């Protein structure tokens, strides 16, 4: 004899009840329920409206960040030499460096970006020139140069050096970002790697470190 059953769905418990029937002609008394088709339809309609409203909600506007980045370094030393260096970069373009340093002897002075922003032992602890590509020292316009090779700044008769430098190798963001590194102004002129001295290809034979300052981001 084939088995017969009635499948009864209970909306209150969200389960299905199966009642076996040995005799298909036997009347079966189903559990009583307060379920009404109209109520179910109303619930579905409300859910549909909610989902439809969520799907049609307007997307949130994107946040746009400023493309201009700025940084500053305040240079101090053991002597009277001091100064301020500001850096500005537009999007992924070159970085513009504005320099003003006072207390120098008149004439050229080597000006470099050094690898570390560590001044715990004065300017000597800023380490070597920033050189992520492992090149020898050179002039700013040379293809083979340290990224931190920024040439010379020239102090006038009053000991004030002002300069604007535009350079592609000292970005404010990315893997070679200069933030957290240090600018150093030197005692002597940088020979730009061409002086023939044993230090020409490492430091430009620019002499001692007069003042230094760590690069930090500033508000745009």
From Swiss-Prot:
One of its GO terms (cellular component) is chloroplast. InterPro entries: SOD-like_Cu/Zn_dom_sf (IPR036423), SOD_Cu/Zn_/chaperone (IPR024134), SOD_Cu/Zn_BS (IPR018152), SOD_Cu_Zn_dom (IPR001424). Binds 1 copper ion per subunit. Pfam families: Sod_Cu. It is found in: Plastid, Chloroplast. Residues 1-66 form a transit peptide. Its EC number is 1.15.1.1. It comes from the Eukaryota. Keywords: Antioxidant, Chloroplast, Copper, Disulfide bond, Metal-binding, Oxidoreductase, Plastid, Transit peptide, Zinc. Cu cation binds at residues 112, 114, 129, 186. The keyword Protease does not apply. Disulfide bonds join 123-212. GO terms for molecular function: copper ion binding; superoxide dismutase activity. Zn(2+) binds at residues 129, 137, 146, 149. Its cofactor is Cu cation; Zn(2+). Homotetramer. This is Superoxide dismutase [Cu-Zn], chloroplastic. The gene is SODCP.
